[in-house]
């Protein structure tokens, strides 16, 4: 089975907007909406700042890379921050520290050199782990929907609707009739709005304020949030997303490199950390979600980024209500489909490399910590090369 899509021709319009860009834009919201909402509701981040900073980075990456490119919350960091109910200052300090590391890696192509350590089995192990976690997240969304999804029907309807929506995703992706996926989501949103009857209210313009974290926040941020996040960020949101961009998009992704991805995420997190947004990355799972649901140009970024900016600038007070109108079972279906396709990328490995990737990816997914995946895969791959140089030469 060919895991890659047909590469995008480099002479195609990089900013066109079609139905595939629309469905691709919403394909990764199953990750962004719950995580961003948790940071807003539990940790007290400003909703407008979160969406404005995310929208700016989404638009900027589209303009820079000229292909559909993902922007996601930093997952490991968000999970720890929410679980420990850390203050906005600590979260913003962590974003600035991660930005500093990524900017250092972008200097003189340091990231391109470091990326060579992440060989194909290591990257595939991370992709498998991310894919499994996406599927698990989709199941948890339906099993225990966040409170913002107020119009969710009683069981077993969410499971039935998720399965129907998942089949719709498969049909849409295989036939390239992306209106099927968009129609499923639109009908679900309409049904949710009808049953919940949310009060949205009118628009009001607001801009994020400059927020400088206190000096004492940086030490806590580094040990609690940055240390567990960095291996996953570099492995999945730098090396793996670069690998997938070239695999999925061919010559159209010529502007994408590990150093440029580090620079993009570094600048984005600097702005976000100073304006009160959330820490973000370019997760490889998000790229699979966008591509598999139809996005083929940076028009997807323009569409998604403009939508986030519109919400963040004019509907700050209503953000949670508006996002809660999306059908949780529809988002879960998008997430499950993207996760399965992302995990399936491991299928092009053979022999010992396949076993390594599956074991490392499965362990990371089991413990919900992909730093374990990265560490184990790196240790085994490069340990084999030290013990048996011949094995390393054959792999290379």
Please give the residue ranges for each predicted region.
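Transmembrane alpha-helix interface/packing and boundary motifs in multi-pass membrane proteins
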Residues: 23-24, 58-68, 172-173, 228-232, ...
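Transmembrane helix boundary and interhelical junction motifs in multipass membrane proteins
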Residues: 30-36, 70-77, 238-240, 277-286, ...
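Transmembrane helix-boundary motif of multi-pass solute transporters/channels
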Residues: 23-85
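Juxtamembrane interface elements at the cytosolic ends of transmembrane helices
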Residues: 30-33, 186, 190, 199-203, ...
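Membrane-embedded helical hairpins/re-entrant loop segments and their flanking transmembrane helices
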Residues: 2-19, 39-60, 227-298
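Membrane-embedded alpha-helical modules
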Residues: 85-199, 303-396
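Hydrophobic, membrane-inserted alpha-helices
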Residues: 31-38, 54-58, 75-80, 161-169, ...
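Hydrophobic, membrane-embedded alpha-helices of multi-pass small-molecule transporters
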Residues: 19-20, 27, 155-165, 194-197, ...
